[in-house]
């Protein structure tokens, strides 16, 4: 999947992708959420969001999602990384640290989003497990430690969207779409754990017993502050006021 040209989805494949997208999206709308998400979600129906999100998901990722079986750990490990300042959704996989006596190591997968401007995916990768990580990343760091996982995992990209020239230049919309797409894809891949897993298991297109990896994400993104930066605390940047419109100038 690295740098290989892929043919477009057939009409049948596109229909299958849209159908599963709609099913998961409707299920997402039933999840608990903070009040500030109400106004955003009220105008983001599935038929409105589908073309916007679909156009930013690579064909190769779509084929993984509409497959009759979940991706193998090897397939997840092959996902390419986009070293970009665009917003996006990514995977981070890891295994138990050290040697394992027998058999293949269990793969653990975290699906996260990068929605801070400026910075995007490249900054998210740099700071996710840093000492100055945000609270939701601190929870991930604790889980890595408790499970004895290696912190030296590998990143792959599922979705990218530019902060500029997207959604009429509204940075808040880019941020919201990135967070919503993260929730969509972590459910779709069955890469969730904790209470959220029991709430979303019926939305996963494959039998959970067929999935050969363990999801590390346990948070419901709709309970996060849409205005809160995912940039490290020491930067003091990244907070976006709701209702902010217009083109965002790049910093130089």
Language-model features: locations:
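Boundary/linker segments flanking structured domains
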Residues: 1-108, 113-252
């Amino acid at each position: 999947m690295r740098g290989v040209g892929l043919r477009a989805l057939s009409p049948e494949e596109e229909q299958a992708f849209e159908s599963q997208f709609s099913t998961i999206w409707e299920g997402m709308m039933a999840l608990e959420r903070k009040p500030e998400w109400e106004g955003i979600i009220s105008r983001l129906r599935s038929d409105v969001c589908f073309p916007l999100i679909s156009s930013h998901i690579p064909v190769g990722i779509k084929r993984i999602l509409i497959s009759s079986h979940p991706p193998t750990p090897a397939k997840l490990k092959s996902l390419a990384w986009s070293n970009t300042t665009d917003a996006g959704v990514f995977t981070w996989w890891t295994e138990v640290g050290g040697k394992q006596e027998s058999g293949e190591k269990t793969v653990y997968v975290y699906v996260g989003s990068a929605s801070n401007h400026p910075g995007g995916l490249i900054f998210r990768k740099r700071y996710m497990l840093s000492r100055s990580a945000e609270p939701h990343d601190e929870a991930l760091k604790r889980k890595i430690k408790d499970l004895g996982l290696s912190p030296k995992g590998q990143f792959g990209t599922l979705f990218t969207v530019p902060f500029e020239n997207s959604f009429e230049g509204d940075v808040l919309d880019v941020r919201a779409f990135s967070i919503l797409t993260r929730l969509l894809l972590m459910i779709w891949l069955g890469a969730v754990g904790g209470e959220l897993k029991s709430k979303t298991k019926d939305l996963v297109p494959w039998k959970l017993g067929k999935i050969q990896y363990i999801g590390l994400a346990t948070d419901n993104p709709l309970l996060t502050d849409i205005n809160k930066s995912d940039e490290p605390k020491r930067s003091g940047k990244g907070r976006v006021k709701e209702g902010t419109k217009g083109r965002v100038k790049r910093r130089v």
